[in-house]
């Protein structure tokens, strides 16, 4: 039977390195920097219904998980990809039961834009009467993809693609952290880190996945893994123009 350590390291690198708190969270300082509105809402457990809108890999799901770890409310993680009206009704029933006993329910719906208008309508009465606090995550413009009545009851927070320096910081953390490659000797230049970051287009998950692939496919000599620009280009199937 695999040990917990082995099972953990079978997880993809982005999952292993997912931050547990806001101090570890990288980027989105306009929302979660010291004194900013979303940080205050999370730290005071004063969450109201909201939509996280931004491109892939910028921290939407991570912020929801941080909220889950800080709130005293019941937290339900829900995917629009694998759920339908039946599952929505079951969750709403659970939320109603929680409300009877004085417990709030936060419902996180990943890829909420995947729900059609009628499915989104099913949330509306429960949001209106406070049975659930809805947190939706979407890569699509909420004005076009979210029911207007539901959207009017949610605060939209816009998450931006990460800056290259933010990505480089994440990559360095991945190399040094015991949850990443901290137990390995890795030779990788700052130029190579910036190259991976530039290829990621502000997507932290993409950058970390690329780093994992690059390290797993780099040559080892005398116990040291040597990362080159060539292997990065091979793994990403992209050619560097800025770093030649």
State the predicted function of each range.
Residues 79-81, 155-168:
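Conserved AAA+ ATPase "SRH/arginine-finger" region at the nucleotide-binding site
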Residues 31-36, 73-106, 117:
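Short glycine-rich substrate-engagement loop in P-loop NTPases that contacts/grips substrate
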Residues 153, 169-182, 216-217:
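Conserved AAA+ ATPase "sensor/coupling" helix adjacent to the nucleotide-binding pocket
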Residues 194-199, 205-220, 231-234:
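C-terminal helical "lid" of AAA+/P-loop NTPase domains
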Residues 1-10, 40-79, 93-96, 124-129:
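Walker A/P-loop
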Residues 39-43, 109, 113-152:
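Conserved catalytic/switch belt of AAA+ P-loop NTPases
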Residues 1-44:
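A short, basic N-terminal segment
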Residues 227-244:
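C-terminal engagement/docking regions of AAA+ P-loop ATPases
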């Amino acid at each position: 039977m695999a040990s917990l350590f082995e099972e953990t390291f079978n997880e993809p690198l982005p999952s292993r390195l997912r931050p547990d708190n806001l101090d570890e969270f990288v980027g989105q300082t306009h929302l979660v920097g010291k004194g900013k509105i979303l940080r205050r809402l999370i730290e005071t457990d004063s969450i109201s219904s909201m939509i996280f809108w931004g491109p892939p890999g910028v921290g939407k799901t991570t912020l929801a998980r941080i909220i889950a770890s800080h709130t005293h409310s019941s937290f339900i993680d829900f995917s629009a990809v694998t759920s339908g009206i039946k599952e929505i009704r079951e969750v709403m029933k659970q939320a109603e039961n929680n409300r009877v006993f004085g417990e709030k329910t936060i419902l996180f719906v990943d890829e909420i834009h995947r729900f059609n208008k009628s499915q989104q309508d099913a949330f509306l009465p429960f949001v209106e009467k406070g049975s659930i606090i809805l947190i939706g995550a979407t890569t699509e413009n909420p004005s076009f993809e979210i029911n207007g009545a539901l959207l009017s009851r949610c605060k939209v927070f816009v998450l931006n693609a990460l800056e290259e320096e933010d990505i480089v910081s994440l990559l360095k953390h991945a190399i040094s952290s015991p949850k990443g490659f901290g137990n390995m000797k890795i030779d990788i230049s700052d130029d190579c880190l910036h190259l991976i970051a530039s290829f990621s287009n502000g997507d932290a998950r993409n950058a970390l996945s690329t780093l994992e692939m690059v390290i797993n496919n780099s040559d080892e000599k005398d116990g040291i893994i040597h990362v080159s620009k060539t292997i990065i280009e091979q793994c990403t199937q992209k050619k560097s123009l800025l770093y030649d």
